[in-house]
Amino acid sequence: MAKKFNEYYLNWDEINQIIAAAKNLKESLVLKILARTGMRRFELSKLEAKDVDFERKRLFIKKGKGATEKDPKSRAVPIDDDTLQTIKFYLGSRKTGFLVQSNKKSHDGISLSQINRIVSNCAKRANVKNPNPKLKNMNPHIFRHSFSRLSLAAGIPFNMVQRIAGHADARTTLQMYGVPSITDTQQLYDEKLVDKFQEKSKNKSNAKLTDFTGKSE
């Protein structure tokens, strides 16, 4: 059975390898925000310097998916100390304008195509391939799927992942990530059950596989 697109994701080692491949502060910042908040690339492109709350360690997203003038789909998301430090270094003394600026015009925000290139180029430098075999290059959305999958695997409740990811309905989070991947299932199966099988087998029977050689029933 073919995997659904949201079942393909990176592990933390792969994510950190891609981040480590950044050539400058801008690339590092883009990768860290995508990987550590699950933010959509559109949302990242619209972030402003004033949307960073350094004291409370939060980013304020004013224009989420489906935002309108009457319903801006705003939300706050937590951010880690390392990413905040990267933001401080990148901004320097600047306190206004877009958080991540365009390569072409300093007063414009980073474009979606620039975000795509940063993710793709850093993944190539790190020699980390897109886990989806149908896609040649790494793309920003794989970071979003990875964040949600890894957060749930770490024990973060569904409603919290929903809030951070900006899903309007918890059912979206449940439908997309509610079923653990076969990789996670296999790992837990091996960690939690296999030893029990062997332990019970030793206690209940001394039979060896060689005892059944040649017997089909």
Regions found by a protein language model. Name each.
Residues 67-88, 97-121:
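C-terminal catalytic core of Y-nucleophile DNA break-rejoin enzymes
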Residues 52-54, 156-176:
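Short, polar N-cap/turn motifs at the start of nucleic acid-interacting alpha helices
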Residues 2, 9, 191-217:
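C-terminal secondary-structure termini that scaffold catalytic or DNA-interacting sites
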Residues 8, 12-41:
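Basic, Lys/Arg- and aromatic-enriched nucleic-acid-binding interface segment
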